[in-house]
Curated annotation (Swiss-Prot):
Part of the phosphoribosylformylglycinamidine synthase complex involved in the purines biosynthetic pathway. Catalyzes the ATP-dependent conversion of formylglycinamide ribonucleotide (FGAR) and glutamine to yield formylglycinamidine ribonucleotide (FGAM) and glutamate. The FGAM synthase complex is composed of three subunits. PurQ produces an ammonia molecule by converting glutamine to glutamate. PurL transfers the ammonia molecule to FGAR to form FGAM in an ATP-dependent manner. It comes from the Archaea. One of its GO terms (molecular function) is phosphoribosylformylglycinamidine synthase activity. GO terms for biological process: 'de novo' IMP biosynthetic process. Pfam families: AIRS, AIRS_C, FGAR-AT_linker. ATP binds at residues 64, 105, 520, 557. Substrate binds at residues 108-111, 130, 260, 332-334, 560. The keyword Transmembrane helix does not apply. GO terms for cellular component: cytoplasm. Pathway: Purine metabolism; IMP biosynthesis via de novo pathway; 5-amino-1-(5-phospho-D-ribosyl)imidazole from N(2)-formyl-N(1)-(5-phospho-D-ribosyl)glycinamide: step 1/2. Belongs to the FGAMS family. This is Phosphoribosylformylglycinamidine synthase subunit PurL. InterPro entries: PRibForGlyAmidine_synth_PurL, PurL_linker, PurM-like_C_dom, PurM-like_C_sf, PurM-like_N, PurM-like_N_sf.
Length: 759
C-alpha cells in the first residue's frame, strides 16, 4: 500500500485521541485539533505520511515546545565576539585561532538506552558525531556523561536490570567510538537508584574545521539538488522521537522497534566521504538524519533557508523492499546525511560515495515556495505548508519553584575515620572509573595530550579535564570536561546548577586552560508537572546567570523531558560540557603529586556545608540549605592561577568527595603520601572540612622554593597552607591531633577496585 487517508475532519475528541494513540503520534488532543483545523482549511483529510510528518516535527524531542520559551528567555543572548554559530544549526561553532574553528555539541539518548542499552548508547555516539560532521568538521574527541541506576539492585518488572544497562551502555559507547577511530577522552559517571528505570546517556563531540569550510544546516538556493548519502533506510527507529517525547512504560516489542540500529562500519567511511566532498567545496548545506529522519532533516533545512522542497523517495536504498512511503519518510535509520549541492556537482559527490562504498540517491531539489511535496511510486504522499510543519506549538508551562531549605544537617561523626575513609573512597560515586574508561580508546588519533588518567605507571589517577591538540602544526589545544551534580541540583536546582558549572570551570582552570564555551544537555522528568518544570526553569536561569557573569557563550544544547517511570522522576540532571583553550599544550597541568617535600595549598573560601555531599547521602540525608558558589571569588581564582601558572606543580578541584577525596586522588597518581593539618581551613568540624563539596576550592602543589612568590599578591583570596607531600601514608591532623593515618596503597586499593564487582 502506497498510502492511506486518515479521516480526522469528522473525528470527535475521543476519536482524535484514539488516532494519536493508534498511530503512535504522541500528540495531545489540542495538537490533534490543530492538525484537524489545518486540513479542514485545505478541504481534505491528511495522508498517513502527512500526519506522521507533523508528529515528528511537533514532538518534544524535535520542537522543544515545552522548553523553547525559557531557553530563549535565559540563554538567547549568550554570545561573544568569538562565537561563530550559537543555537542555530546542528552544533555550535566557536573560533579557535582565527583560521580554524571548533565545533561542539552534546545530545541525550536516554529512552533508547533504557530499552536497548547497547544499541541506544552506540547510536547516541554515532548521532553526535554526525551533528559535528554536518558542520563540515573533522570529529576529534568524544565525551560521555552517564547517569545510571543502582547496579546492585535486582531486575524491575518490565524494565532491564541496572547492571545489565550499565554493561550495555558502556559496551555500546566502546564499540561504536573505538571502531570509528575517534578518541573518547572526557565525561562522568554517576549512580543513583532514581536512574534505575531511566538511565541518562549524554554524548558529546568536538570537531575542528577551517573557517572557510564551515557548512550550514540551511538551504541556500532554489534549484539546488538534494542528495542522500550513507547507509540504507529501514524500519528501525520509526517513531523514535515520539517515543523519546513520552514517559517510559514497560519494555515491549513496539518500544524496541523505536530504537535505531547503529553501524560504525558505515559511519567511519561516511566521515571520510563527507570531509572529502567538503574539502572539494561540493556541499552547499548539510544535515544529519537523526531524530525524525528525512522528514525532520529535509523540512528543517529548507525551512531555515526560507524555501521549500520537492522530494521523490523511489531511489532511496532500502533495507526492506516493502516499506511504505511514510515509513521511508520518518525512518531514523542511522549513518545517513542529507546534502544540498549544485546540479553540476551531483556526479562528483556520487563518485566520492562510490569510492567509500556508500549508498547514494538523488532525492529532490530546493523550491522557491514554502511547501514540502513528497512523491512515492508516482503518487503525491505529502503536500503541506512548511511553516505549519515546522512552527510547532510553544508552551509556557506553569511551574512551581521548590522552597529553599534554611536548615543545615550535620551527620554524626564516624567513630573510626581510618576505617570510614576506606569505605568512603570505595563508594560508587567516589571510586575510580578505570574499569569503564579503559575500555575506550583515548589516543587513537594521536592528538590526546592529557588523557582521562594521569600519573606514574600503575599509579594513575583521574584528570580534572583532558587536552586535545587538534591541529598538527599548532601547539594550541582544547581543554574538555563534562558532568553534572544531580545530588546538588536535587536539593536546590539553581544553586546546584551553578555548582555544576563552577566545577567544570575549575576543571579547566586546574588543567591550565581558560574556559571558552559551554553546551548543555538538560535532563528532567515530566514537564507537565509544575515542580519538574520549576526545576528546569531554575536550572536554565542558573546557566544564564553563570555564563553571563563569566563571559561564556552557550552555543548548543539539548533538552530531554519525560524521564520518569510510574511517576518516579530522575534526579534533575543538567549536564554541562565546557571547552577551554590552552595556548601551548606543553603547559598543561595534571592532578597527581609530582614529588616529596612540596607544599600543599587550598585556595578558595571553605564552604563548611555538607548538604548534597556524598558524605551526607551516605548517612541518609538528601536535603538542607545549599549555598551557591561565589562567582566573584571564582573570577579572582581564575586570574590568580593565570598569574601563578609557572609555580604550580599539580592541581585538583574540590568537588565530589570533598577535600579528602581531592588530596587522596592527587596522592594516588604517584604513590606519594602527604601530611596535612586542617585546623586553619575553618572552625567547622573535621568531617565538614574534609567532605564538604560546595564552594570554589582547589588544591595546589607548590615547590618549597616558590612558596613566598606564590602567596604574594593574592589580593584577599583565601589561601591556606595545609601541609607537605612525602612518605607513603595519608596523614590528616586537626589542631595537632591525628585523625586519619592510612597507607596510600591501602586506600588506593579500596578506591581502585570499587567498581570491580559490577562490570
Amino acid at each position: 500500500m502506497i498510502f492511506r487517508t486518515i479521516r480526522i475532519r469528522d473525528a470527535d475528541d475521543a476519536r482524535l485521541k484514539a488516532i494519536s494513540k493508534r498511530l503512535g503520534l504522541a500528540l495531545s488532543l489540542d495538537e490533534m485539533k490543530a492538525v484537524r483545523s489545518y486540513f479542514e482549511r485545505l478541504g481534505r483529510d491528511p495522508i498517513d505520511a502527512e500526519i506522521h510528518a507533523v508528529a515528528q516535527s511537533w514532538s518534544e524531542h524535535c520542537s522543544y515546545k515545552s522548553s523553547k520559551y525559557y531557553l530563549k528567555k535565559y540563554l538567547g543572548s549568550l554570545k561573544t565576539d568569538y562565537t561563530i554559530l550559537a543555537m542555530e544549526d546542528d552544533a555550535g561553532v566557536v573560533d579557535f585561532d582565527g583560521e580554524y574553528a571548533y565545533v561542539l555539541k552534546m545530545e541525550s539518548h536516554n529512552h533508547p538506552s533504557a530499552v536497548e542499552p547497547y544499541g541506544g548508547a552506540a547510536t547516541g555516539i554515532g548521532g553526535i558525531v554526525r551533528d559535528v560532521l554536518c558542520m563540515g568538521a573533522q570529529p576529534v574527541a568524544l565525551i560521555d556523561s552517564l547517569f545510571l541506576g543502582d547496579v546492585s539492585s535486582d531486575r524491575y518488572e518490565g524494565l532491564l536490570s541496572p547492571r545489565y544497562i550499565f554493561g550495555g551502555v558502556v559496551g555500546g559507547i566502546r564499540d561504536y567510538g573505538n571502531r570509528i577511530g575517534i578518541p573518547n577522552v572526557a565525561g562522568s559517571l554517576y549512580f543513583d537508584k532514581l536512574y534505575n528505570s531511566n538511565p541518562l546517556v549524554n554524548a558529546g563531540c568536538v570537531g575542528i574545521v577551517r573557517r572557510d569550510r564551515i557548512v550550514r544546516s540551511k538551504s541556500y538556493k532554489p534549484g539546488d539538488v538534494l542528495v542522500l548519502m550513507g547507509g540504507k533506510t529501514g524500519r528501525d527507529g520509526i517513531h523514535g522521537v515520539n517515543f523519546a517525547s513520552t514517559t517510559l512504560g514497560k519494555v515491549t516489542k513496539s518500544s524496541r522497534l523505536a530504537i535505531q540500529l547503529g553501524n560504525p562500519i558505515v559511519e567511519q567511511p561516511m566521515i571520510k566521504a563527507v570531509l572529502e566532498a567538503n574539502d572539494a567545496g561540493l556541499i552547499r548545506a548539510m544535515k544529519d538524519l537523526g531524530g525524525g529522519g528525512l522528514s525532520s532533516a529535509a523540512t528543517e533545512m529548507v525551512y531555515a533557508g526560507g524555501f521549500g522542497a520537492e522530494i521523490t523517495l523511489d531511489d532511496i536504498k532500502l533495507k526492506e523492499s516493502n516499506m511504505s512511503g511514510w515509513e521511508i519518510w520518518i525512518s531514523e535509520s542511522q549513518e545517513r546525511m542529507l546534502m544540498e549541492c549544485y546540479p553540476e556537482d551531483v556526479e562528483k559527490i556520487r563518485q566520492i560515495a562510490e569510492k567509500w562504498n556508500l549508498d547514494f540517491s538523488v532525492i529532490g531539489q530546493v523550491t522557491a515556495d514554502r511547501r514540502i511535496r513528497v512523491y512515492y511510486k508516482k503518487r503525491k504522499i505529502i503536500d503541506m505548508d512548511i511553516e505549519f510543519l515546522d512552527d510547532s506549538p510553544v508552551y509556557q508551562r506553569p511551574y512551581r519553584i521548590k522552597e529553599v531549605e534554611k536548615s543545615v544537617t550535620v551527620p554524626q561523626e564516624p567513630e573510626d575515620l581510618n576505617s570510614f575513609v576506606r569505605d568512603f573512597m570505595a563508594r560508587l560515586n567516589t571510586c575510580a572509573r578505570f574499569n569503564v574508561v579503559r575500555q575506550y580508546d583515548h589516543t587513537v588519533r594521536g592528538s590526546t595530550i592529557v588523557t582521562p588518567f594521569v600519573g606514574r605507571p600503575n599509579k594513575e589517577t583521574h584528570a580534572d579535564a583532558t587536552v586535545i591538540k587538534p591541529l598538527e602544526n599548532s601547539m594550541r589545544g582544547l581543554v574538555l570536561t563534562s558532568g553534572s551534580r544531580p545530588n546538588m541540583v536535587s536539593v536546590d536546582p539553581y544553586a546546584g546548577t551553578l555548582l555544576t558549572l563552577a566545577e567544570a570551570y575549575k576543571n579547566i582552570l586546574s588543567t591550565g586552560g581558560r574556559p571558552h564555551s559551554v553546551v548543555d544537555a538538560l535532563n528532567f522528568g515530566n514537564p507537565e508537572r509544575e515542580e519538574i518544570m520549576g526545576q528546569f526553569v531554575e536550572s536554565v536561569r542558573a546557566i544564564g546567570d553563570f555564563c553571563r557573569k563569566m563571559g561564556l557563550p552557550v552555543v548548543a544544547g539539548n533538552v530531554s523531558f519525560y524521564n520518569e517511570y510510574r511517576k518516579t522522576d530522575i534526579m534533575p540532571t543538567p549536564t554541562i560540557m565546557m571547552v577551554g583553550l590552552i595556548d601551548d599544550v606543553r603547559r598543561s597541568r595534571t592532578t597527581y603529586m609530582k614529588g616529596s617535600g612540596n607544599a600543599i595549598y587550598l585556595i578558595g573560601e571553605p564552604c563548611d556545608n555538607l548538604t548534597g555531599s556524598e558524605y551526607s547521602r551516605m548517612h541518609g540525608y538528601t536535603d538542607g540549605f545549599l549555598p551557591a558558589p561565589d562567582l566573584d571569588e571564582l573570577t579572582r581564582i581564575r586570574d590568580f592561577l593565570s598569574s601563578k601558572a609557572d609555580m604550580i606543580l599539580s592541581s585538583h578541584d574540590v568537588s565530589s568527595g570533598g577535600l579528602f577525596a581531592a588530596l587522596s586522588e592527587m596522592s594516588f597518581g604517584s604513590g606519594i603520601g602527604f601530611h596535612v593539618d586542617i585546623s586553619n581551613v575553618s572552625a567547622a568540624r573535621p568531617t565538614v572540612k574534609l567532605f564538604s563539596e560546595c564552594g570554589n576550592g582547589l588544591v595546589l602543589e607548590i615547590a618549597k622554593d616558590k612558596e613566598e612568590q606564590f602567596v604574594d599578591g593574592s589580593n584577599g583570596l583565601a589561601i591556606k597552607r595545609l601541609g607537605e607531600t612525602g612518605g607513603d601514608r595519608i596523614i590528616v591532623d586537626e589542631a595537632g591531633l591525628n585523625i586519619i593515618d592510612v597507607a596510600v596503597d591501602d586506600l588506593r586499593g579500596a578506591w581502585e577496585h570499587g567498581l570491580d564487582r559490577y562490570i
